[in-house]
Amino acid sequence: MTVLPSVDFFPSGNTSVAIEPRLPQADFPEHHHDFHEIVIVEHGTGIHVFNGQPYTITGGTVCFVRDHDRYLYEHTDNLCLTNVLYRSPDRFQFLAGLNQLLPQELDGQYPSHWRVNHSVLQQVRQLVAQMEQQEGENDLPSTASREILFMQLLLLLRKSSLQENLENSASRLNLLLAWLEDHFADEVNWDAVADQFSLSLRTLHRQLKQQTGLTPQRYLNRLRLMKARHLLRHSEASVTDIAYRCGFSDSNHFSTLFRREFNWSPRDIRQGRDGFLQ
Protein backbone atom coordinates (compact mmCIF):
# COMPACT_ATOMS: atom_id res chain seq x y z
CA MET A 1 0.00 0.00 0.00
CA THR A 2 1.25 3.49 -0.86
CA VAL A 3 2.32 5.59 2.14
CA LEU A 4 2.43 9.37 1.64
CA PRO A 5 4.98 11.02 4.00
CA SER A 6 4.43 14.45 5.51
CA VAL A 7 7.84 15.66 4.31
CA ASP A 8 6.44 15.70 0.75
CA PHE A 9 3.53 17.99 1.63
CA PHE A 10 4.54 20.33 4.46
CA PRO A 11 6.97 23.14 3.51
CA SER A 12 8.98 22.76 6.71
CA GLY A 13 9.14 20.73 9.90
CA ASN A 14 7.49 23.57 11.82
CA THR A 15 4.49 23.94 9.50
CA SER A 16 1.32 22.74 11.22
CA VAL A 17 -1.16 23.26 8.33
CA ALA A 18 -0.78 22.88 4.56
CA ILE A 19 -3.19 23.15 1.62
CA GLU A 20 -3.09 20.57 -1.16
CA PRO A 21 -5.60 21.13 -4.01
CA ARG A 22 -6.55 18.33 -6.38
CA LEU A 23 -8.16 19.95 -9.42
CA PRO A 24 -9.15 17.39 -10.53
CA GLN A 25 -8.57 14.29 -8.42
CA ALA A 26 -8.06 11.25 -10.62
CA ASP A 27 -8.64 7.65 -9.56
CA PHE A 28 -5.97 6.82 -6.99
CA PRO A 29 -5.10 3.47 -5.38
CA GLU A 30 -5.48 2.70 -1.70
CA HIS A 31 -3.05 4.65 0.47
CA HIS A 32 -2.56 6.25 3.85
CA HIS A 33 -0.25 8.90 5.27
CA ASP A 34 1.50 9.95 8.46
CA PHE A 35 -0.59 13.11 8.88
CA HIS A 36 -4.27 14.01 9.19
CA GLU A 37 -6.39 15.88 6.66
CA ILE A 38 -9.79 17.37 5.97
CA VAL A 39 -10.94 16.55 2.44
CA ILE A 40 -13.35 19.13 1.02
CA VAL A 41 -15.18 18.20 -2.19
CA GLU A 42 -15.61 21.33 -4.32
CA HIS A 43 -17.61 19.70 -7.11
CA GLY A 44 -17.83 16.60 -9.28
CA THR A 45 -18.52 13.05 -8.14
CA GLY A 46 -16.60 9.95 -7.21
CA ILE A 47 -16.39 6.96 -4.93
CA HIS A 48 -14.34 7.26 -1.75
CA VAL A 49 -13.54 3.79 -0.41
CA PHE A 50 -12.66 4.63 3.19
CA ASN A 51 -11.35 1.86 5.44
CA GLY A 52 -12.98 -0.62 3.08
CA GLN A 53 -16.40 1.08 2.92
CA PRO A 54 -17.55 2.89 -0.25
CA TYR A 55 -19.03 6.39 0.00
CA THR A 56 -20.46 8.40 -2.88
CA ILE A 57 -18.95 11.89 -2.66
CA THR A 58 -20.20 15.06 -4.36
CA GLY A 59 -19.82 18.81 -3.94
CA GLY A 60 -20.25 19.66 -0.25
CA THR A 61 -18.93 16.35 1.09
CA VAL A 62 -16.33 16.78 3.83
CA CYS A 63 -14.21 13.85 5.02
CA PHE A 64 -12.02 13.78 8.12
CA VAL A 65 -9.02 11.50 7.59
CA ARG A 66 -6.80 10.32 10.45
CA ASP A 67 -3.20 9.21 10.10
CA HIS A 68 -4.13 5.52 10.26
CA ASP A 69 -7.11 5.60 7.87
CA ARG A 70 -6.67 4.01 4.45
CA TYR A 71 -8.65 5.07 1.39
CA LEU A 72 -8.80 5.28 -2.37
CA TYR A 73 -10.66 7.22 -5.05
CA GLU A 74 -12.35 5.53 -7.99
CA HIS A 75 -14.93 6.22 -10.67
CA THR A 76 -14.16 9.94 -10.44
CA ASP A 77 -15.95 12.39 -12.71
CA ASN A 78 -14.52 15.93 -12.67
CA LEU A 79 -13.89 15.44 -8.95
CA CYS A 80 -12.22 18.54 -7.53
CA LEU A 81 -10.92 18.50 -3.95
CA THR A 82 -9.17 20.77 -1.51
CA ASN A 83 -7.18 18.89 1.12
CA VAL A 84 -6.39 20.73 4.35
CA LEU A 85 -3.49 18.84 5.89
CA TYR A 86 -2.45 18.98 9.53
CA ARG A 87 0.12 16.89 11.34
CA SER A 88 -1.98 15.88 14.34
CA PRO A 89 -4.66 17.41 16.61
CA ASP A 90 -2.00 17.87 19.30
CA ARG A 91 0.77 19.26 17.04
CA PHE A 92 -0.38 22.88 16.87
CA GLN A 93 1.69 25.63 18.38
CA PHE A 94 -1.14 27.92 19.50
CA LEU A 95 -4.16 25.59 19.65
CA ALA A 96 -5.15 22.93 22.18
CA GLY A 97 -8.15 20.65 22.65
CA LEU A 98 -8.93 20.29 18.93
CA ASN A 99 -9.95 16.66 19.38
CA GLN A 100 -13.17 17.87 20.97
CA LEU A 101 -14.19 19.49 17.66
CA LEU A 102 -13.26 16.55 15.43
CA PRO A 103 -15.45 13.49 14.71
CA GLN A 104 -15.06 10.85 17.40
CA GLU A 105 -15.15 7.10 16.97
CA LEU A 106 -17.90 5.48 19.07
CA ASP A 107 -18.47 1.74 19.39
CA GLY A 108 -16.27 1.14 16.37
CA GLN A 109 -18.17 3.64 14.20
CA TYR A 110 -16.29 6.69 12.92
CA PRO A 111 -18.49 9.44 11.38
CA SER A 112 -15.89 10.38 8.80
CA HIS A 113 -18.12 11.92 6.12
CA TRP A 114 -20.08 15.12 6.71
CA ARG A 115 -22.02 17.35 4.34
CA VAL A 116 -22.31 21.14 4.09
CA ASN A 117 -24.43 23.23 1.77
CA HIS A 118 -23.30 25.54 -1.01
CA SER A 119 -23.24 28.74 1.04
CA VAL A 120 -21.04 27.11 3.69
CA LEU A 121 -18.78 25.78 0.94
CA GLN A 122 -18.27 29.37 -0.23
CA GLN A 123 -17.20 30.38 3.29
CA VAL A 124 -14.87 27.38 3.43
CA ARG A 125 -13.21 28.49 0.17
CA GLN A 126 -12.57 31.95 1.61
CA LEU A 127 -10.88 30.56 4.72
CA VAL A 128 -8.78 28.14 2.68
CA ALA A 129 -7.73 30.96 0.33
CA GLN A 130 -6.53 32.99 3.32
CA MET A 131 -4.50 30.03 4.56
CA GLU A 132 -2.98 29.57 1.11
CA GLN A 133 -1.93 33.22 1.01
CA GLN A 134 0.16 32.71 4.13
CA GLU A 135 1.92 29.52 3.05
CA GLY A 136 5.69 29.90 3.15
CA GLU A 137 5.56 32.38 6.03
CA ASN A 138 7.04 30.77 9.13
CA ASP A 139 7.25 33.67 11.57
CA LEU A 140 5.18 33.43 14.75
CA PRO A 141 2.40 35.87 13.71
CA SER A 142 1.89 33.99 10.41
CA THR A 143 1.86 30.63 12.16
CA ALA A 144 -0.66 31.91 14.70
CA SER A 145 -2.82 33.38 11.92
CA ARG A 146 -2.87 30.08 9.97
CA GLU A 147 -3.81 28.14 13.07
CA ILE A 148 -6.59 30.60 13.90
CA LEU A 149 -7.95 30.21 10.36
CA PHE A 150 -7.81 26.43 10.78
CA MET A 151 -9.81 26.72 14.00
CA GLN A 152 -12.36 28.92 12.21
CA LEU A 153 -12.63 26.33 9.44
CA LEU A 154 -13.16 23.52 11.93
CA LEU A 155 -15.79 25.49 13.84
CA LEU A 156 -17.60 26.39 10.62
CA LEU A 157 -17.70 22.78 9.43
CA ARG A 158 -18.82 21.44 12.79
CA LYS A 159 -21.50 24.08 13.34
CA SER A 160 -22.81 23.82 9.78
CA SER A 161 -22.96 20.03 9.86
CA LEU A 162 -24.68 19.93 13.26
CA GLN A 163 -27.15 22.59 12.16
CA GLU A 164 -27.91 20.93 8.82
CA ASN A 165 -31.66 21.14 9.16
CA LEU A 166 -34.80 22.00 7.22
CA GLU A 167 -34.28 25.76 7.01
CA ASN A 168 -33.60 25.82 3.25
CA SER A 169 -33.84 23.50 0.27
CA ALA A 170 -30.05 23.10 -0.04
CA SER A 171 -29.86 21.77 3.51
CA ARG A 172 -32.84 19.51 2.90
CA LEU A 173 -31.18 18.09 -0.21
CA ASN A 174 -28.04 17.29 1.81
CA LEU A 175 -30.18 15.47 4.35
CA LEU A 176 -31.85 13.58 1.51
CA LEU A 177 -28.47 12.52 0.07
CA ALA A 178 -27.36 11.29 3.49
CA TRP A 179 -30.66 9.40 3.81
CA LEU A 180 -30.13 7.72 0.43
CA GLU A 181 -26.67 6.58 1.53
CA ASP A 182 -28.34 4.61 4.33
CA HIS A 183 -31.51 3.54 2.48
CA PHE A 184 -30.21 2.83 -1.04
CA ALA A 185 -31.60 -0.73 -0.95
CA ASP A 186 -35.13 0.39 -0.06
CA GLU A 187 -37.87 0.83 -2.64
CA VAL A 188 -37.74 4.58 -3.25
CA ASN A 189 -40.85 6.54 -4.19
CA TRP A 190 -39.55 9.95 -5.24
CA ASP A 191 -42.86 11.70 -4.54
CA ALA A 192 -42.82 10.35 -0.98
CA VAL A 193 -39.13 11.20 -0.53
CA ALA A 194 -39.72 14.75 -1.76
CA ASP A 195 -42.53 15.12 0.79
CA GLN A 196 -40.38 13.61 3.53
CA PHE A 197 -37.74 16.29 3.03
CA SER A 198 -40.20 19.13 2.35
CA LEU A 199 -39.10 19.56 -1.26
CA SER A 200 -41.18 19.81 -4.37
CA LEU A 201 -40.44 17.01 -6.82
CA ARG A 202 -39.28 19.58 -9.36
CA THR A 203 -36.88 21.18 -6.86
CA LEU A 204 -35.54 17.76 -5.88
CA HIS A 205 -34.80 16.92 -9.52
CA ARG A 206 -33.25 20.29 -10.29
CA GLN A 207 -31.03 20.57 -7.22
CA LEU A 208 -29.87 16.96 -7.24
CA LYS A 209 -28.96 17.30 -10.92
CA GLN A 210 -27.06 20.52 -10.18
CA GLN A 211 -25.13 18.95 -7.30
CA THR A 212 -24.38 15.51 -8.74
CA GLY A 213 -24.85 15.86 -12.49
CA LEU A 214 -27.38 13.02 -12.36
CA THR A 215 -31.15 12.65 -12.23
CA PRO A 216 -32.46 11.25 -8.92
CA GLN A 217 -33.05 7.75 -10.29
CA ARG A 218 -29.71 7.72 -12.09
CA TYR A 219 -27.99 8.79 -8.87
CA LEU A 220 -29.78 6.08 -6.89
CA ASN A 221 -28.92 3.43 -9.49
CA ARG A 222 -25.27 4.46 -9.43
CA LEU A 223 -25.24 4.37 -5.64
CA ARG A 224 -26.72 0.87 -5.68
CA LEU A 225 -24.29 -0.29 -8.34
CA MET A 226 -21.32 1.08 -6.39
CA LYS A 227 -22.43 -0.79 -3.28
CA ALA A 228 -22.93 -3.93 -5.36
CA ARG A 229 -19.47 -3.66 -6.90
CA HIS A 230 -17.97 -3.37 -3.42
CA LEU A 231 -19.79 -6.52 -2.31
CA LEU A 232 -18.70 -8.39 -5.44
CA ARG A 233 -15.10 -7.61 -4.56
CA HIS A 234 -15.26 -8.14 -0.82
CA SER A 235 -17.92 -10.78 -0.11
CA GLU A 236 -18.73 -14.34 -1.13
CA ALA A 237 -22.44 -13.67 -1.73
CA SER A 238 -23.86 -14.70 -5.11
CA VAL A 239 -24.51 -12.15 -7.84
CA THR A 240 -28.26 -12.66 -7.44
CA ASP A 241 -28.12 -12.18 -3.68
CA ILE A 242 -26.02 -9.03 -4.05
CA ALA A 243 -28.47 -7.63 -6.60
CA TYR A 244 -31.36 -8.07 -4.17
CA ARG A 245 -29.37 -6.72 -1.22
CA CYS A 246 -28.61 -3.57 -3.21
CA GLY A 247 -32.19 -2.80 -4.18
CA PHE A 248 -32.59 -4.58 -7.54
CA SER A 249 -35.58 -6.88 -7.89
CA ASP A 250 -34.34 -8.49 -11.12
CA SER A 251 -30.80 -9.87 -11.34
CA ASN A 252 -30.82 -9.75 -15.15
CA HIS A 253 -31.74 -6.06 -15.11
CA PHE A 254 -29.04 -5.53 -12.48
CA SER A 255 -26.42 -7.19 -14.71
CA THR A 256 -27.46 -5.04 -17.68
CA LEU A 257 -27.19 -1.80 -15.68
CA PHE A 258 -23.93 -2.95 -14.11
CA ARG A 259 -22.26 -3.58 -17.46
CA ARG A 260 -23.56 -0.28 -18.80
CA GLU A 261 -22.11 1.58 -15.81
CA PHE A 262 -18.71 -0.10 -15.52
CA ASN A 263 -18.14 -1.80 -18.91
CA TRP A 264 -17.64 -5.04 -16.98
CA SER A 265 -20.11 -7.71 -15.98
CA PRO A 266 -20.66 -8.61 -12.31
CA ARG A 267 -18.87 -11.91 -12.99
CA ASP A 268 -15.88 -10.00 -14.42
CA ILE A 269 -15.64 -7.95 -11.22
CA ARG A 270 -15.97 -11.05 -9.05
CA GLN A 271 -13.04 -12.61 -10.93
CA GLY A 272 -10.93 -9.45 -10.76
CA ARG A 273 -10.75 -8.92 -14.52
CA ASP A 274 -11.18 -5.15 -14.18
CA GLY A 275 -7.71 -4.80 -12.62
CA PHE A 276 -9.08 -3.22 -9.42
CA LEU A 277 -6.66 -0.66 -7.98
CA GLN A 278 -4.84 -2.01 -4.95
From Swiss-Prot:
GO BP of this protein: positive regulation of DNA-templated transcription; rhamnose metabolic process
Keywords from the UniProt entry: Activator, Cytoplasm, DNA-binding, Repeat, Rhamnose metabolism, Transcription, Transcription regulation
InterPro entries for this protein: AraC-bd, AraC_XylS_family_regulators, Homeodomain-like_sf, HTH-like, HTH_AraC, HTH_AraC-typ_CS, RhaR_RhaS-like_N, RmlC-like_jellyroll
Residue ranges occupied by any HTH araC/xylS-type domain in the UniProt entry: 174-272
HAMAP family in alphabetical order: HTH_type_RhaS
Name under which the protein is recorded: HTH-type transcriptional activator RhaS
GO function term, MF aspect, one: DNA-binding transcription factor activity
Listed NCBIfam families: PRK13503.1
Places the protein is found: Cytoplasm
Residue ranges: DNA binding: 191-212, 239-262
Annotated site location: Interaction with sigma-70: 241, 250
GO (cellular component) term, any one: cytoplasm
Main location as per UniProt: cytoplasm
Role played: Activates expression of the rhaBAD and rhaT operons.
PANTHER family in the record: HTH-TYPE TRANSCRIPTIONAL ACTIVATOR RHAS, HTH-TYPE TRANSCRIPTIONAL ACTIVATOR RHAS-RELATED
Superkingdom of origin organism: Bacteria
Summary of subunit composition and partner proteins: Binds DNA as a dimer.
Organism: Shigella dysenteriae serotype 1 (strain Sd197)
CDD domains the UniProt entry points to: cupin_RhaR_RhaS-like_N
